[in-house]
């Protein structure tokens, strides 16, 4: 396996260091190439993602990312110039966000309900394509638009991926949208779900408006198995999912090209946390969980299961104990 490693900014290098220790323990011999992308490169060269580096990334099997973001950076420069550019250039049309409440982790929801679902979010369309603009900026007559782009091709491949995952899980899929108001895009999504559902007769299909889904994710999260949704709604509900599962510090994600044409990228959802960077107190659990997603994507199923099991056992016994970054890595390594 050829792995590109982007440690990034803030606590990124610290959490990725522990994630790589776990990766090496379960799959020895992974060929790694480290790339210094983020605020340091920008301040040094004025570049965010050089074309030559992007070409090199394409030659790897997968990418592991730490965190991107620094208060010294202009807003949006790294997000659009690095993260979104990688997503679009490498066709990461699937954003995969598991939502699982592990034993031993405290949910803000009463009774610590059983939660185990996955959100399949469309990653390259919607209002994130940059299709829009503004006129008469700064005047009382300013007009700003953000156009949400939904293509039959783009929607279908995400829906197909979601059905495949539902078939392998508890055989239940929920489309989350707002088709009573967003009638054009909503109709395309619902018709696509109905068409693909015919190929998966064992999978039960449900629909929820996005506002209703946010309520049910809090009041009855156990009803969800696989959620499929568009880019914007997915961006919102996945953070809510992380919150009910114990916090964004335990949230892993995958940005996936399901065709395997390009390397997929895996990362913890948390930010770069510059306020605690370098102190050795950042929790690397989400980065290690991202390694499990990476291994599963690369068909290293046994290794992925070992990492997931080790994380689960660590969380089940950790309690409120304050551990350093390295101590968390040591504990999880000890559970392998």
Curated annotation (Swiss-Prot):
GO BP terms: L-leucine biosynthetic process
Top-rank taxon: Bacteria
Cofactor info, note text: Binds 1 Mg(2+) or Mn(2+) ion per subunit.
Record Gene3D superfamilies: Isopropylmalate Dehydrogenase
InterPro entries reported in the protein's UniProt record: ICDH/IPMDH, IsoCit/isopropylmalate_DH_CS, IsoPropMal-DH-like_dom, LeuB_actb
Keyword annotations of the record: Amino-acid biosynthesis, Branched-chain amino acid biosynthesis, Cytoplasm, Leucine biosynthesis, Magnesium, Manganese, Metal-binding, NAD, Oxidoreductase
Residues annotated to bind Mg(2+): 211, 235, 239
Name the UniProt record assigns to this protein: 3-isopropylmalate dehydrogenase
Gene label: leuB
Keyword Oxidoreductase tagged: yes
Known role: Catalyzes the oxidation of 3-carboxy-2-hydroxy-4-methylpentanoate (3-isopropylmalate) to 3-carboxy-4-methyl-2-oxopentanoate. The product decarboxylates to 4-methyl-2 oxopentanoate.
Catalytic function, reaction form: (2R,3S)-3-isopropylmalate + NAD(+) = 4-methyl-2-oxopentanoate + CO2 + NADH
Positions that bind substrate: 87, 97, 121, 211
Annotated compartments: Cytoplasm
